[in-house]
UniProtKB/Swiss-Prot annotation:
Purpose: Specifically methylates the pseudouridine at position 1915 (m3Psi1915) in 23S rRNA.
Annotated gene: rlmH
Similarity annotation: Belongs to the RNA methyltransferase RlmH family.
Protein's recorded name: Ribosomal RNA large subunit methyltransferase H
Enzyme class: transferase
Provenance organism: Streptococcus pneumoniae serotype 4 (strain ATCC BAA-334 / TIGR4)
Length: 159
């Protein structure tokens, strides 16, 4: 199995990079792992709704270019489905059983995700109603992916 995480924007904070690197290394025991950072569009101060939509579409096209036809795509969106960690683990396991060899997670930029990206998704997941910086969400996501694998393997990490 291959896990891809496609994100918009460059990660600058060392503590987040270190955490992501640690969990990426741990995930690699279970699956091939790849983090893809795409450049974000500069959003003007007090941008109009049409300017925001144009930015979303440009970023959306960049995201879609990184998704293969056979990828199972999971977008992170506040309106998505919430899971307990055990349910999330089961979802990932079932996706693999259904024959998908690549799981692609998508984290949008500060404006979110375009409708074209959301429409391409096989599943929309929410980690709750809280608003988190998308940079921090990367770390939360890779930790939960690692946790999902440890649940599947019966490791004591998840208690």
């Amino acid at each position: 199995m291959k896990i891809k995480v496609v994100t918009v924007g460059k990660l600058k904070e060392k503590y987040l990079k270190d955490g992501i690197a640690e969990y990426s290394k741990r995930i690699s025991r279970f699956a091939k792992f790849e983090m893809i950072e795409l450049s974000d569009e500069k959003t003007p101060d007090k941008a109009s709704e049409s300017e925001n939509q144009k930015i979303l579409e440009i970023e959306g096209q960049r995201i879609l270019s990184k998704i293969a036809d056979r990828d199972f795509v999971i977008v992170l969106a506040i309106e998505g489905k919430t899971f307990f960690s055990e349910e999330f683990s089961k979802q990932l396991e079932e996706t693999s059983i259904k024959g998908f060899s690549t799981l692609t997670f998508i984290i949008g930029g500060s404006l979110g995700l375009s409708s074209s990206v959301k429409n391409r998704a096989n599943l929309s997941v929410s980690f709750g109603r809280l608003t988190l910086p998308h940079q921090l969400m990367r770390l939360v996501l890779v930790e939960q992916i690692y946790r999902a694998f440890t649940i599947q393997q019966g490791f004591p990490y998840h208690k």
